[in-house]
UniProtKB/Swiss-Prot annotation:
<dbReference type="Pfam" id="PF00252">
    <property type="entry name" value="Ribosomal_L16"/>
</dbReference>
<dbReference type="InterPro" id="IPR036920">
    <property type="entry name" value="Ribosomal_uL16_sf"/>
</dbReference>
<dbReference type="GO" id="GO:0019843">
    <property type="term" value="F:rRNA binding"/>
</dbReference>
<keyword id="KW-0689">Ribosomal protein</keyword>
<keyword id="KW-0934">Plastid</keyword>
<dbReference type="GO" id="GO:0003735">
    <property type="term" value="F:structural constituent of ribosome"/>
</dbReference>
<dbReference type="GO" id="GO:0009536">
    <property type="term" value="C:plastid"/>
</dbReference>
<dbReference type="GO" id="GO:0032543">
    <property type="term" value="P:mitochondrial translation"/>
</dbReference>
<dbReference type="InterPro" id="IPR047873">
    <property type="entry name" value="Ribosomal_uL16"/>
</dbReference>
<dbReference type="InterPro" id="IPR016180">
    <property type="entry name" value="Ribosomal_uL16_dom"/>
</dbReference>
<dbReference type="InterPro" id="IPR020798">
    <property type="entry name" value="Ribosomal_uL16_CS"/>
</dbReference>
<dbReference type="GO" id="GO:0009507">
    <property type="term" value="C:chloroplast"/>
</dbReference>
<keyword id="KW-0150">Chloroplast</keyword>
<dbReference type="InterPro" id="IPR000114">
    <property type="entry name" value="Ribosomal_uL16_bact-type"/>
</dbReference>
<keyword id="KW-0687">Ribonucleoprotein</keyword>
<protein>
    <recommendedName>
        <fullName>Large ribosomal subunit protein uL16c</fullName>
    </recommendedName>
</protein>
<comment type="subunit">
    <text>Part of the 50S ribosomal subunit.</text>
</comment>
């Protein structure tokens, strides 16, 4: 699963997801893409599940690009612990996704194959998303 090799700080604030994505919102590598329509945190597990689903469906053909990376640690406190005594320990990693962000790109396959593969990956995501085709 994806996670940073090293970070400057172990823990981060939660932050907030205002507005829409102005970076990473156009197709750069492949011909087809999956674009997020809602703001959310997508975990490293969800990213990997989507990638695997696309790879399995496409078989040998095509290439897949994952355009998001989980670089934000999410901390969780142990259950049934009293309040206080600091922030919990980092449990998993998430990618902060705003509307308009491209999640996956695909190339080297026909549009029908790409459409089905990307729809399978979309079903693994916790948000509404849409299929995009590169207009030439």
């Amino acid at each position: 699963m994806l996670s940073p090799k090293r970070t400057r700080f172990r823990k981060q604030h939660r932050g907030r997801m205002k507005g829409k994505s102005y970076r990473g919102n156009c197709i750069c590598f492949g011909r087809y893409a999956l674009q997020a329509l809602e703001p959310t945190w997508i975990t490293a597990r969800q990213i990997e599940a989507g990638r695997r689903a696309m790879t399995r469906y496409a078989r040998r053909g095509g290439k897949i690009w994952v355009r998001i990376f989980p670089d934000k640690p999410v901390t969780i406190r142990p259950t049934e612990t009293r309040m206080g005594s600091g922030k919990g320990s980092p449990e998993y990693w998430v990618a902060v996704v705003k509307p308009g962000r491209i999640l996956y790109e695909m190339g080297g396959v026909s549009e029908t194959v790409a459409r089905v593969a990307i729809s399978i990956a979309a079903s693994k995501m916790p948000i509404r998303s849409q299929f995009l085709r590169l207009e030439i």
